[in-house]
């Protein structure tokens, strides 16, 4: 069973994906997401923080992600890009959530929406990103 927070992360990634693909304004995308049946089971506050925070800071986040990529940024799958941007926001702006939780949630969201091995790619990038963004947080064992 998915938690409200997982649903919020999935919906935020879907919203970021829509913004990358359709170039629709964020308020319109959020309105459309809120009309989805799954939204009633989501944490609305978390969705808002993730989606609007990612939208506001996406240019900064891609600057943090770009040097960690093993391919050209243009070759990134849009789902992987949306997951990485959303997780980068959560790592940067939500210190109350431990980074292993953020990475695990991003992996699970990528497994749901991404390609066959996309979750492995996302895991590798986010491990490096977490070390940069949260260098003082205790490491996983």
Swiss-Prot record:
Pfam family of the protein (one): NusB
One of the GO biological process terms: DNA-templated transcription termination
GO cellular component, one term: cytosol
Signal peptide positions on this chain: none
Keywords for the protein's UniProt record, in alphabetical order: RNA-binding, Transcription, Transcription antitermination, Transcription regulation
Domain of life: Bacteria
Gene Ontology molecular functions: RNA binding
Family stated for the protein in its record: Belongs to the NusB family.
Known role: Involved in transcription antitermination. Required for transcription of ribosomal RNA (rRNA) genes. Binds specifically to the boxA antiterminator sequence of the ribosomal RNA (rrn) operons.
HAMAP family linked to this entry: NusB
Name of the featured protein: Transcription antitermination protein NusB
Organism: Neisseria meningitidis serogroup C / serotype 2a (strain ATCC 700532 / DSM 15464 / FAM18)
């Amino acid at each position: 069973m998915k938690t409200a927070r997982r649903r919020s992360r999935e919906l935020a990634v879907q919203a970021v994906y829509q913004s990358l693909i359709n170039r629709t304004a964020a308020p319109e995308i959020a309105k459309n997401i809120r009309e989805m049946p799954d939204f009633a089971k989501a944490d609305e506050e978390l969705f808002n923080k993730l989606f609007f925070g990612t939208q506001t800071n996406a240019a900064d986040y891609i600057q943090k992600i770009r040097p960690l990529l093993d391919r050209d940024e243009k070759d990134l799958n849009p789902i992987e890009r949306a997951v990485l941007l959303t997780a980068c926001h959560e790592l940067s702006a939500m210190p109350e959530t431990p980074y292993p939780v953020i990475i695990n949630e991003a992996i699970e969201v990528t497994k749901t929406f991404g390609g066959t091995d996309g979750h492995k790619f996302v895991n590798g990038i986010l491990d490096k990103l977490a070390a940069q963004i949260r260098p003082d947080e205790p490491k996983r064992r």
